[in-house]
């Protein structure tokens, strides 16, 4: 890195001088390292100061000792002390003054002169005292007047006599002394003055000049940039002002025509009064003989419905053109086109004027067509007929996609008294009422939270979208505790009879147990099960469980009189073992256990209702939930199919049930009657709104991931479990969370998934289902009734043999 070097530059007085603080200054050795191998640079001092011995000694010491800090010499002027001389001038006695800062009082005293006596002046004054009466202050005043009265050239003696009001002899002596001293002085004045800038500009580079004048810079005018935007604004302003002037002219002509019409009406009445035509017969004869005069301007045949998209045809039938007024004529006013924005403009509609064509002798169509404007307040459709202003078009958030009417197109207004015929609306509102569009209570697993009522649909690109619906229980659903789903609590889900509408705020009376049992028996309750993609057959045990499940499903479809049930085994090798049937003794023990469980759950429900009566009274009125343990469900299924039937089916390849994150599956759903599936989808609690007015749909994209497959012979871990759920009809679902790898599947009766009646069901199975439905489950206020899998760290046990050890509740919601 090269060292810094300096070169002599011309001093610039306009350049500001830098001001350094003590901490900003570099060290002395950094200064010494700077190379000054340049010609003789002026030091900024006078030649006499440069030749002083203390400065020369400092420079020579630096050359001798080098750049060592210890040998540096700070140039300090020498001071001499003469105590005798000091004592002769100043008195020895010193008294502390009352104040250290003296301020001269405002009085009529003369100002003190700026000139100070020196030793030579003092010698001259002492010599002059012998001849004349003069004091040092008087001498200073005289010299001060002479210095201030003279500029570059000293004043003459005659001018000095005019300045000084003293004796001529004294003036002459002082003047001669002043002229002699002024000539010997190097400066222009004897009074030390601050050196100022000369007007001729010669002192620009003089470093001793202080208080320089400001550089007079010409203030240039900042011209406004005339760009295209400002030019367009001026054009718009001119257009608006011209339109206002034209409107005022039209109003003036309209009022003038009205006044003429009034005068003509008065003349007609006077003529009729003079003729005695009180009955109007003469007037009618004259009107009959009068030939209809064709209007000067053509009347456009444009229906009014074309001009407004907010008015229905029925509402505008009464606003047609009035034919009985013959004096009115319609004028064509096409909208003015601007070349900068070529747009497809609608055909200009006509606005009826209040004056006859004969009353407009000096009115030209050019003046009328120059600007688009409403002619009168008597025309309610004039604002609609006229096109939108450019400001509104520019501020339109849709931009180029904004709606614009096209010529020749007729737009019908929407029927506000009717709702849309959407598939999810009820048939009474004109919809299809399809069960595929039901709203269900939805719970996400990642992150684990309850969303409220939602429904799944496939969007663009196969993405699954959740449409959310508003309900009165949203505040409660959002704070549900998902870890307390096993505790029984009344559920408000049964309050909704229909679940095909997006608004679930309207509640109906809850169904009693008998009605629910009737619906179950008649299979009017349907179950929505989403299709899942087939997983790679990497495990032989997994493949065997799939084959067993498919064989059971086909057998159930082939026999219309009975349901099928798939049983679980303890390990993979025993997937094809025989089904264990219940004996009479086991059935009696099972009934006693069910009764004891029912009593315990009823007691817990009463305690929970008393504790939460103040906070969730409204939510507990219709919140009913029924439970059924897995063993009872398996027993009810075994009553419909023998153990020999479970082992006699052939194994074939088919689609099996899988798992999914948040219940997001790639394809649409399959509808089967009374189907048990071991899945972990999002909660689908089917609810029903009765009105579609206050609908709040919030679609949200759900990430689709492939879940793990839960099969008959697949061994689950402690962190993952399966949830078995049964959906009956529109708003009932049986959920069986289980820790054992069991798939309880009651398959549909045929391939078309048509619900059938339970005509061939034994009475014992129906009694068992009725007894199980009497149990009430507990659902806490901070949790949702859903099908989210709950972690169960229990060991795998047989589902049918060990009923008391591993009894899991099945929720009927």
Swiss-Prot record:
Signal peptide: none annotated. It comes from Mus musculus (Mouse). Residues 310-403, 484-513, 528-577, 779-813 are annotated as: Disordered. This is Enhancer of polycomb homolog 1. Disruption phenotype: Mice are viable but display growth retardation, homeotic transformations of the axis and sterility in both males and females. Male sterility is caused by defects in generation of elongating spermatids. Component of the NuA4 histone acetyltransferase (HAT) complex, a multiprotein complex involved in transcriptional activation of select genes principally by acetylation of nucleosomal histones H4 and H2A. The NuA4 complex plays a direct role in repair of DNA double-strand breaks (DSBs) by promoting homologous recombination (HR). The NuA4 complex is also required for spermatid development by promoting acetylation of histones: histone acetylation is required for histone replacement during the transition from round to elongating spermatids. GO terms for biological process: double-strand break repair via homologous recombination; negative regulation of gene expression, epigenetic; negative regulation of transcription by RNA polymerase II; positive regulation of DNA-templated transcription; positive regulation of double-strand break repair via homologous recombination; positive regulation of striated muscle cell differentiation; positive regulation of transcription by RNA polymerase II; regulation of apoptotic process. Its main location: nucleus. Residues 311-333, 788-797 have a biased composition (Basic and acidic residues). Component of the NuA4 histone acetyltransferase complex which contains the catalytic subunit KAT5/TIP60 and the subunits EP400, TRRAP/PAF400, BRD8/SMAP, EPC1, DMAP1/DNMAP1, RUVBL1/TIP49, RUVBL2, ING3, actin, ACTL6A/BAF53A, MORF4L1/MRG15, MORF4L2/MRGX, MRGBP, YEATS4/GAS41, VPS72/YL1 and MEAF6. KAT5/TIP60, EPC1, and ING3 together constitute a minimal HAT complex termed Piccolo NuA4. Component of a NuA4-related complex which contains EP400, TRRAP/PAF400, SRCAP, BRD8/SMAP, EPC1, DMAP1/DNMAP1, RUVBL1/TIP49, RUVBL2, actin, ACTL6A/BAF53A, VPS72 and YEATS4/GAS41. Interacts with TRIM27. Keywords: Activator, Chromatin regulator, Cytoplasm, Differentiation, Growth regulation, Isopeptide bond, Nucleus, Phosphoprotein, Spermatogenesis, Transcription, Transcription regulation, Ubl conjugation. Residues 346-361, 564-577 have a biased composition (Low complexity). There is a cross-link at residues 319, 650 (Glycyl lysine isopeptide (Lys-Gly) (interchain with G-Cter in SUMO2)). PANTHER family: ENHANCER OF POLYCOMB. It is found in: Nucleus; Cytoplasm. One of its GO terms (molecular function) is chromatin-protein adaptor activity. Pfam families: E_Pc_C (PF06752), EPL1 (PF10513). GO terms for cellular component: cytoplasm; NuA4 histone acetyltransferase complex; nuclear body; nuclear membrane; nucleolus; nucleoplasm; nucleosome; nucleus. Expressed in adult brain, heart, kidney, liver, lung, skeletal muscle and testis. Expressed in male germ cells, present in round spermatids of steps 1 to 4. The lineage of its organism: Eukaryota, Metazoa, Chordata, Craniata, Vertebrata. InterPro entries: Enhancer_polycomb, Enhancer_polycomb-like_N, Enhancer_polycomb_C. The modification Phosphoserine is found at residue 538. Belongs to the enhancer of polycomb family. Residues 486-513 have a biased composition (Polar residues).
């Amino acid at each position: 890195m090269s060292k810094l070097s300096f070169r002599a530059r011309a001093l610039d007085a306009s350049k500001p001088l830098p001001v350094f603080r003590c901490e900003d200054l570099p060290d002395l050795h950094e200064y010494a390292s700077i190379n000054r191998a340049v010609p003789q640079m002026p030091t900024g001092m006078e030649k006499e100061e440069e030749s002083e011995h203390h400065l020369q000694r400092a420079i020579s010491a630096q050359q001798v000792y080098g750049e060592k800090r210890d040998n540096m010499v700070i140039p300090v002027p020498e001071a001499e002390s003469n105590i005798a001389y000091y004592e002769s001038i100043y008195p020895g006695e010193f008294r502390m003054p009352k104040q250290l800062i003296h301020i001269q009082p405002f009085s009529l005293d003369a100002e003190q002169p700026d000139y100070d006596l020196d030793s030579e002046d003092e010698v001259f004054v002492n010599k002059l005292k012998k001849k004349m009466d003069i004091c040092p202050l008087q001498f200073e005043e005289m010299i001060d007047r002479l210095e201030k009265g003279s500029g570059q050239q000293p004043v003459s003696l005659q001018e000095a006599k005019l300045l000084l009001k003293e004796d001529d002899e004294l003036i002459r002596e002082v003047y001669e002394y002043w002229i002699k001293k002024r000539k010997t002085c190097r400066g222009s004045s004897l009074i030390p003055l601050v050196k100022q800038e000369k007007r001729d500009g010669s002192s620009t580079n003089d470093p001793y000049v202080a208080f320089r004048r400001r550089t007079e810079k010409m203030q240039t005018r900042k011209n406004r940039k005339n760009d295209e935007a400002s030019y367009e604004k001026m054009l718009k302003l001119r257009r608006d002002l011209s339109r206002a002037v034209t409107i005022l002219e039209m109003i003036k002509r309209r009022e003038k025509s009205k006044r003429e019409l009034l005068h003509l009406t008065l003349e007609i009445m006077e003529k009729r009064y003079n003729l005695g035509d009180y009955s109007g017969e003469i007037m009618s004869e004259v009107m009959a003989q009068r030939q209809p005069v064709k209007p000067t301007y053509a009347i456009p045949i444009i229906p009014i419905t074309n001009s407004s998209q907010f008015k229905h045809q029925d509402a505008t039938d009464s606003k047609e053109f009035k034919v009985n007024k013959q004096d009115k004529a319609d004028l064509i006013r096409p909208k003015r086109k601007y070349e900068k924005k070529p747009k497809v403009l609608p055909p200009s509609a006509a606005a009826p004027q209040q004056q006859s064509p004969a009353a407009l002798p000096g009115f030209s169509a050019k003046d009328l067509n120059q600007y688009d404007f409403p002619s009168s307040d008597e025309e309610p459709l004039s604002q609609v007929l006229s096109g939108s202003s450019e400001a509104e078009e520019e501020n339109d958030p849709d931009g180029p996609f904004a709606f614009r009417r096209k010529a020749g197109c007729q737009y019908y207004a929407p029927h506000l008294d009717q709702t849309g015929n959407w598939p999810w609306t009820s048939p009474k509102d004109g919809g299809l009422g399809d069960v595929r569009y039901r709203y269900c209570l939805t719970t996400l697993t990642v992150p684990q939270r309850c969303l409220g009522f939602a429904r799944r649909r496939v969007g663009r690109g196969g993405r699954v979208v959740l449409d959310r619906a508003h309900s009165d229980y949203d505040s409660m659903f959002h704070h549900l505790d998902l870890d307390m789903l096993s505790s029984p609590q009344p559920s408000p889900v049964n309050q909704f009879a229909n679940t095909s509408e997006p608004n679930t705020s309207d509640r109906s009376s809850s169904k009693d147990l008998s009605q629910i049992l009737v619906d179950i028996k008649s299979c009017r309750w349907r179950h929505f099960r989403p299709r899942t993609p087939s997983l790679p057959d990497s495990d032989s045990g997994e493949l065997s469980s799939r084959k067993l499940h498919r064989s059971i499903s086909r057998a159930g479809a082939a026999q219309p009189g009975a349901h099928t049930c798939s049983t679980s085994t303890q390990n993979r090798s025993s997937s094809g073992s025989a089904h264990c049937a219940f004996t009479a003794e086991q059935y009696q023990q099972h009934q006693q256990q069910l009764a004891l469980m029912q009593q315990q759950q009823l007691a817990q429900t009463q305690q929970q209702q008393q504790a939460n009566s103040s906070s969730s009274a409204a939510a507990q009125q219709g919140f009913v939930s029924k439970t059924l343990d897995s063993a009872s469900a398996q027993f009810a299924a075994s009553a419909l199919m023998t153990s020999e039937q479970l082992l006699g089916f052939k194994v074939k390849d088919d689609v099996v049930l899988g798992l999914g994150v948040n219940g997001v599956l790639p394809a649409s759903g399959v509808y089967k009657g009374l189907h048990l599936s071991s899945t972990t989808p999002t909660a689908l609690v089917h609810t029903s709104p009765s009105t579609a007015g206050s609908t709040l749909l919030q679609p949200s994209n759900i990430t689709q991931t492939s879940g793990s497959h839960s099969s008959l012979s697949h061994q689950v871990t402690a962190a993952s479990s399966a949830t078995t759920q049964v959906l009956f009809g529109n708003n009932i679902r049986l959920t069986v969370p289980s820790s054992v790898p069991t798939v309880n599947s009651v398959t549909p009766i045929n391939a078309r998934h048509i619900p059938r009646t339970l005509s061939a069901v034994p009475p014992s199975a129906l009694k068992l289902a009725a007894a199980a439905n009497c149990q009430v489950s507990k659902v806490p206020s901070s949790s949702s009734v859903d099908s989210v899998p709950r972690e169960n760290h229990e060991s795998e046990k047989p589902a049918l043999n060990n009923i008391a050890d591993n009894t899991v509740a099945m929720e009927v919601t």
